[in-house]
């Protein structure tokens, strides 16, 4: 049995020996075995003559210009043809990109603790299966131990990191001490200095710094040809609630006028996953490690083992500070070859655990991969640089010393085909999914339909977002092909079941809104379709396992379809640009019902009516003087509870009245909607709800569908919201403000649930109403005038108040003074 080290030895070798005792630290270390790295002397040393540095080619390095750096997704799309064949690449930002790291705040650096894992580096590749491993071996090897360890992204549940006997038997999941960053840095420096210690002929220690090549050669010597045990700590997979992000977020308080370029940037990993054009923006939940970044605090030799990202997503890693990280990447085209090579050389480990690579605890030399014909490439990531990995690209690596990095996933539209392959593979492996792939796929299709419709509408705005979505559509477009492939897959599986058409039923819209629906057999996501039986109303199967659900008669079974095959075929045609199908799907996406009868009626009405253009109405009819008074009048006469818009004391500034189109769609009982109407109003910024910003509300011509309402954040024109309803248009803005507030951890007042779209446009401001009414002296917009003549002003005021369900008190919201 190994003798525990003397207390004096521990004090002598700890990097914190010159600091006063920390009671919390003592509590942390008590949880570990006396022989853990933090308690032991660093006795092992560098063996340069036995270095095993892999000789492989470097992956490409990209240096975007300031202009290219503005849009991360556009830049990734630009470099993809050059970088994807390597599976990995390095991106060096412009020299002006120097985001401050919030982790260096004294309260975080010195006071906030984070958990670590112990990683036994010498067993990452060459180890015996747990069942064959002699129980005494661990103690025996510790006598000549070196120090080193932890692990990389596991995706494991907290239960897998417990100290239960079962967890202890699982390789790579031993919990280490809790450290502050200050403590961890000192410990990491002490370990590295001791390990690479050099002495001159007189026995004096020579100060020197090992190169990346020196460290790399020693690392692979330890992994491939170990002589002693080497353990290190690794603060891996640190969730947002532990240390938080290294980037400042929009809601956080900070000093300096240039901070907005960092808090709002897409290269800020808190913003990246949900950028317009990333399919992950259609995922409602904040999935830790996927949509919410994880931190990694490393020391020399701490490792992240070979793995691919969940759902074969892209990943982006930013190196906040510290010493370099060395990466190795294998392109997705070589993924199967890597798996085959590792199975060949590590047969016992794979026999015991067929899904070994899912555990992220197995390292494997790039030199052996190269010998097996697997393409592998190297990246050295320095502080302030990004590393991008591509779909299904295996990657691994280690740290050269104390450092901190942060990573998150992203899913450009080209990922969809890879994501589909991933969920089919997961189904075969009976592996649970993290995302609903079909929900993301349909979300992308809906967004593309909206973009195509907005671009096709009269005066459609060709903003960056809409044009980007358009580029994925058309015949053989990336998104079109993804929907087409999914349609063909569904058709084939329904046909293979051979069920009667009477068994096909419409899936309820909220089928999976409140709970995850997955196949009882293979865990396949059931957002698009599901098979069920009367005998088990709460259990469902995917179409591949429908016949395995139960032994009941086929007639008792049913198939739920979110969309029929005809509807999905129509969606494909809509994305290809077929106008009739685009109208149908625009109707669905924009939230109104559409039928052939309605279309016929609308066509006949529009074909008979004349468009009367009164020109740009002179807005000097006391509008500038009146519109602020209108707010007071509306608030005093509406009665009832206040909407958000009324509570804010909305001041709508008219910009252009536009001109009238005389058709029944261009008015309703309560307002007239002139084509070209534009107004300005202040409301909470959808990107930063802590401040108020101007929005431009306008009315466009959507052809047969009548007016199309658009609201745009004036300072950020790409932030536009379209709908065929003024009310729903502003509700979209409200929802976005709430979503952003939630993601930034800002409070959401429970009564802040309602907004009056007509009021936000200005269609309830008396002076604006009067000016619009003057455009129709002959009362040709019959529905509006009939209602106005038949009802009293009190009735109209009652309508306004009846649409308001929220009551707000004036004061501050998110720290902003209400107007």
Swiss-Prot record:
Zinc finger feature spans (C5HC2): 519-571
Tissue specificity: Expressed in vascular tissues of roots, cotyledons, leaves and flowers. Expressed predominantly in phloem companion cells of roots. Present in inflorescences, roots, siliques, leaves and stems.
Record note on cofactor: Binds 1 Fe(2+) ion per subunit.
Main location: nucleus
A single GO cellular-component term on record: nucleus
Biased composition (Basic and acidic residues): 8-30
Record EC number: 1.14.11.-
Biased composition, class Low complexity, residue ranges: 155-165
Residues of the FYR N-terminal domain: 644-702
Biased composition range(s): Basic residues: 130-154
Disruption phenotype: Weak late-flowering phenotype.
Residues that hold Zn(2+) 2 according to the record: 533, 535, 550, 552
Catalytic reaction(s) noted: N(6),N(6),N(6)-trimethyl-L-lysyl(4)-[histone H3] + 2-oxoglutarate + O2 = N(6),N(6)-dimethyl-L-lysyl(4)-[histone H3] + formaldehyde + succinate + CO2; N(6),N(6)-dimethyl-L-lysyl(4)-[histone H3] + 2-oxoglutarate + O2 = N(6)-methyl-L-lysyl(4)-[histone H3] + formaldehyde + succinate + CO2
Keyword flag Ribosomal protein: no
GO molecular function annotation: dioxygenase activity; histone H3K4 demethylase activity; transcription cis-regulatory region binding; zinc ion binding
Segments of this protein annotated with the region Disordered: 1-39, 120-171
Chain positions of motif Nuclear localization signal: 130-137
Binding residue positions for Zn(2+) 1: 519, 522, 542, 545
Signal sequence range: none
UniProt: Fe cation binding residues: 307, 309, 395
Function, as annotated: Histone demethylase that demethylates 'Lys-4' (H3K4me) of histone H3 with a specific activity for H3K4me3 and H3K4me2. No activity on H3K9me3/2, H3K27me3/2 and H3K36me3/2. Involved in the control of flowering time by demethylating H3K4me3 at the FLC locus and repressing its expression. The repression of FLC level and reduction in H3K4me3 at the FLC locus results in induction of the flowering activator FT, which is a downstream target of FLC.
Protein name per the record: Lysine-specific demethylase JMJ18
Annotated source species: Arabidopsis thaliana
Taxonomic lineage: Eukaryota, Viridiplantae, Streptophyta, Embryophyta, Tracheophyta
């Amino acid at each position: 049995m190994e003798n525990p080290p003397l207390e004096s030895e521990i004090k002598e070798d700890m990097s914190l020996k010159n600091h006063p005792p920390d009671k919390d630290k003592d509590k942390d270390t008590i949880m570990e075995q006396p022989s853990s790295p933090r308690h032991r002397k660093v006795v092992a040393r560098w063996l340069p003559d036995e270095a095993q540095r892999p000789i492989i080619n470097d992956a490409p390095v990209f240096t975007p210009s300031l202009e290219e750096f503005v849009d991360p997704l556009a830049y990734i799309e630009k470099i993809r043809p050059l970088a994807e064949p390597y599976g990995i690449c390095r991106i060096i930002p412009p020299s002006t990109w120097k985001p401050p790291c919030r982790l260096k705040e004294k309260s975080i650096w010195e006071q906030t603790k984070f958990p670590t894992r112990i990683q036994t580096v010498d067993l990452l590749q060459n180890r015996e299966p747990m069942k064959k491993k002699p129980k005494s071996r661990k103690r025996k090897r510790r006598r000549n131990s070196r120090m080193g360890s932890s692990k990389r992204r596991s995706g494991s549940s907290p239960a897998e990191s417990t100290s239960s006997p079962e967890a202890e038997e699982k390789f790579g999941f031993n919990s280490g001490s809790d450290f502050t960053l200050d403590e961890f840095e000192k410990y990491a420096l002490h370990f590295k200095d001791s390990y690479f210690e050099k002495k001159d002929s007189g026995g004096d220690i020579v100060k020197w710094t090992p190169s990346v090549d020196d460290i790399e050669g020693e690392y692979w010597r330890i992994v491939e040809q170990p002589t002693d045990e080497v353990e290190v700590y690794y603060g891996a997979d640190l969730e947002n609630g532990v240390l938080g992000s290294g980037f400042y977020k929009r809601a956080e308080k900070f000093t300096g006028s240039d901070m907005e370029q960092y808090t709002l940037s897409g290269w800020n990993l808190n913003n990246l996953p949900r950028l317009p054009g990333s399919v992950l923006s259609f995922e409602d939940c904040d999935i830790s490690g996927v949509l919410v970044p994880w931190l990694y605090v490393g020391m020399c030799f701490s490792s992240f083992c070979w793995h691919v990202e969940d759902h074969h997503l892209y990943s982006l890693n930013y190196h906040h500070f510290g010493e370099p990280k060395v990466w190795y990447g294998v392109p997705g085209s070589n993924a199967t070859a890597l798996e085959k090579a590792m199975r060949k050389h590590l047969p016992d480990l794979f026999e015991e655990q067929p899904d070994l690579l899912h555990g992220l605890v197995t390292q494997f030399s790039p030199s052996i991969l190269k010998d097996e014909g697997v393409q592998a490439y190297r990246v050295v990531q320095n502080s302030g640089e990004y590393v991008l990995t591509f779909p299904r690209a295996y990657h691994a690596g280690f740290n050269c010393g104390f450092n901190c990095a942060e990573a998150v996933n992203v899913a450009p539209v080209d990922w969809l085909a890879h994501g589909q392959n991933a969920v089919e593979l997961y189904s075969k492996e009976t592996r649970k999914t993290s995302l609903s792939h079909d929900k993301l796929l349909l979300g992308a299709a809906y967004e593309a339909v909206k973009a195509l419709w907005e671009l096709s509408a009269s005066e459609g705005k060709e903003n960056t977002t809409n044009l980007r979505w358009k580029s994925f559509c058309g015949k053989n477009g990336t998104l079109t092909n993804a929907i087409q492939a999914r349609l063909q897959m569904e058709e084939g599986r329904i046909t293979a079941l051979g069920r009667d058409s009477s068994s096909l039923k419409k899936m309820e819209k909220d089928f999976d809104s409140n709970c995850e629906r997955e196949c009882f057999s293979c865990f396949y996501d059931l957002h698009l379709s599901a098979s069920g039986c009367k005998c088990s109303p709460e259990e469902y199967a995917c179409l591949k396992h429908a016949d395995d659900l139960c032994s009941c008669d086929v007639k008792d079974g049913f198939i739920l379809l979110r969309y029929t095959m005809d509807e999905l075929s129509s969606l494909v045609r809509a994305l290809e640009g077929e106008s009739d199908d685009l109208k149908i799907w625009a109707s669905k996406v924009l939230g109104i019902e559409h039928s052939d009868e309605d279309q016929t009626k609308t066509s006949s009405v529009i074909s008979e009516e004349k468009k009367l253009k009164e020109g740009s109405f002179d807005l000097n009819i006391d509008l500038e003087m009146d519109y602020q008074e209108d707010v007071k009048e509306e608030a005093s006469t509406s009665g009832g509870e206040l909407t958000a818009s009324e509570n804010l004391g909305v001041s709508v500034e008219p910009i252009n009245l536009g001109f009238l189109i005389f058709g029944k769609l261009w008015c309703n009982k309560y307002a007239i909607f002139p084509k070209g109407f534009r107004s300005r109003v202040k409301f909470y910024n959808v990107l930063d709800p802590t401040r108020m910003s101007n929005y431009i509300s306008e009315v466009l011509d959507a052809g047969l569908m009548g007016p199309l309402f658009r609201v745009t954040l004036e300072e950020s024109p790409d932030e536009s919201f379209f709908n065929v309803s003024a009310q729903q248009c502003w509700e979209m803005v409200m929802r976005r403000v709430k979503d952003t507030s939630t993601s930034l951890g800002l409070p959401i007042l429970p009564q802040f649930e309602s907004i009056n779209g007509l009021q936000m446009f200005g269609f309830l401001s008396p002076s604006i109403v009067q000016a619009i009414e003057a455009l129709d002296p002959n009362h040709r917009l019959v529905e509006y005038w009939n209602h106005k003549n038949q009802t009293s002003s009190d009735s109209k005021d009652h309508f306004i108040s009846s649409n308001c369900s929220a009551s707000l008190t004036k004061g501050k919201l998110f720290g902003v003074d209400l107007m």
